[in-house]
From Swiss-Prot:
Protein family: Belongs to the alternative ribosome-rescue factor A family.
Protein name: Alternative ribosome-rescue factor A
InterPro entries linked to this entry: ArfA
Lineage per the UniProt record: Bacteria, Pseudomonadati, Pseudomonadota, Gammaproteobacteria, Enterobacterales
Pfam families per record: ArfA
Effect of residue 9 to V: 75% decrease in kcat for peptidyl-transferase by RF2
Primary role: Rescues ribosomes stalled at the 3' end of non-stop mRNAs. This activity is crucial when the stalled ribosome cannot be rescued by the SsrA(tmRNA)-SmpB quality control system. Binds the 30S subunit, contacting 16S rRNA with the N-terminus near the decoding center and its C-terminus in the mRNA entry channel; contacts change in the presence of release factor 2 (RF2, also named PrfB). Requires RF2/PrfB to hydrolyze stalled peptidyl-tRNA on the ribosome; recruits and probably helps position RF2/PrfB correctly in the ribosomal A site so RF2's GGQ motif can hydrolyze the peptidyl-tRNA bond.
Biased composition (Basic residues): 33-47
Outcome, altering residue 8 to A: 75% decrease in kcat for peptidyl-transferase by RF2
Organism: Escherichia coli (strain K12)
Length: 72
């Protein structure tokens, strides 16, 4: 089991109260997955790009040994 490294420095008096004010136990707002307030500006798969066009670039720079052997 790993130990949590708190950010409160040297705890002197009340360790439980110091941990309650640590960022580990801060309040978090959950984002709705569906319904009101669930719109996400960036899509789920928006950063993948166009995968069909990327494969065409690889074939453009590909050279074979047949071209080199015909020059001799």
């Amino acid at each position: 089991m790993s130990r949590y490294q708190h950010t409160k420095g040297q705890i002197k008096d009340n360790a439980i109260e110091a941990l309650l004010h640590d960022p580990l136990f801060r309040q978090r707002v959950e984002k709705n997955k569906k319904g009101k307030g669930s719109y996400m500006r960036k899509g789920k798969h928006g950063n993948r790009g166009n995968w069909e066009a990327s494969g065409k670039k690889v074939n453009h720079f590909f050279t074979t040994g047949l071209l080199l052997s015909g020059a001799c």
